[in-house]
UniProtKB/Swiss-Prot annotation:
It is found in: Secreted, Extracellular space, Apoplast. InterPro entries: Invertase/methylesterase_inhib, Pectinesterase_inhib_dom, PME_Inhibitor. One of its GO terms (cellular component) is apoplast. Glycans are attached at residues 54, 75. Belongs to the PMEI family. SUPFAM superfamilies: Plant invertase/pectin methylesterase inhibitor. Keywords: Apoplast, Disulfide bond, Glycoprotein, Secreted, Signal. One of its GO terms (molecular function) is pectinesterase inhibitor activity. This is Pectinesterase inhibitor 6. Pectin methylesterase (PME) inhibitor that targets PME from seeds and modulates PME activity and pectin methylesterification during seed germination. Promotes mucilage release by limiting methylesterification of homogalacturonan in seed coat epidermal cells. Disulfide bonds join 53-62, 118-165. SMART domains: PMEI (SM00856). The gene is PMEI6.
Length: 208
């Protein structure tokens, strides 16, 4: 990780750690707070997120989007998978809002159709992501294999939806600023979904 990318991570982790110490009702923790080596702690949490993201194709994007969850997720594979789906949901909703806005100002029939089709695909993708998040919140050993199978189906479908949206823009001759912006944001969303699927595969391998 470069210094430019790790700097905001370090700052926010330090801020979160300070808040945890300040808000912790345990006096012993507060009294020993000055003895905590914050640099070592930040390094440890950075290691957690880097280790989690090692299995992903878009590693830098994974680290950048998931590091706020390091304090909670640590070495818990299921928490990392859940966090990645939650992040993808947030980004998918942003893309949907953008598609709704840009569809009204589309230039030409081919652009309007591409934006409309993309919106339908992202609606379906969001539905699959929500179903995935619901299951990730209720994982249990007795149903784990079935749950993993369902999750793989839904996340793969969400990724296919994102890919199909991008393919639609390849087929249109429109290269307006609107199309370029939507493609850029949809590409990020597709990559987040790919990372979520990779983390799910790690969860399937590691187990609960």
């Amino acid at each position: 990780m470069t210094s430019s990318s790790s700097s905001p991570i370090t700052f926010t982790l330090l801020l979160l750690l300070s808040l945890l110490v300040a808000l912790n009702p345990n006096p012993s923790l507060a009294s020993t707070g000055s003895n905590i080596n914050t640099n070592d702690i930040v390094t440890q949490y950075s290691t957690y997120v880097r280790n989690a993201c090692n299995v992903t194709r878009y590693n830098r994007l994974c680290v950048r989007t998931l590091w706020p969850f390091a304090i909670v997720a640590r070495n818990n594979t299921s928490k990392w998978a859940r966090a990645s789906v939650a992040v993808t949901i947030t980004d998918t909703k942003r893309v949907l809002r953008l598609l709704l806005k840009t569809q009204r100002s589309a230039v030409g029939e081919s652009e309007r159709i591409a934006l409309s089709d993309c919106r339908e695909l992202f609606v379906d993708s969001l539905d699959n992501l929500y179903k995935s998040l619901a299951v990730l919140r209720t994982l249990n050993a007795d149903e784990f294999q079935r749950q993993i199978s369902d999750l793989a189906t839904w996340l793969s479908a969400a990724l296919t939806d994102d890919d199909t949206c991008l393919d639609g823009f390849e087929e249109t001759s429109s290269r307006t600023r609107t199309v370029r912006m939507v493609r850029r944001k949809a590409t990020k969303c597709m990559r987040l979904c790919s990372n979520a699927l990779a983390l799910l595969k790690k969860l399937a391998f590691d187990g609960l």
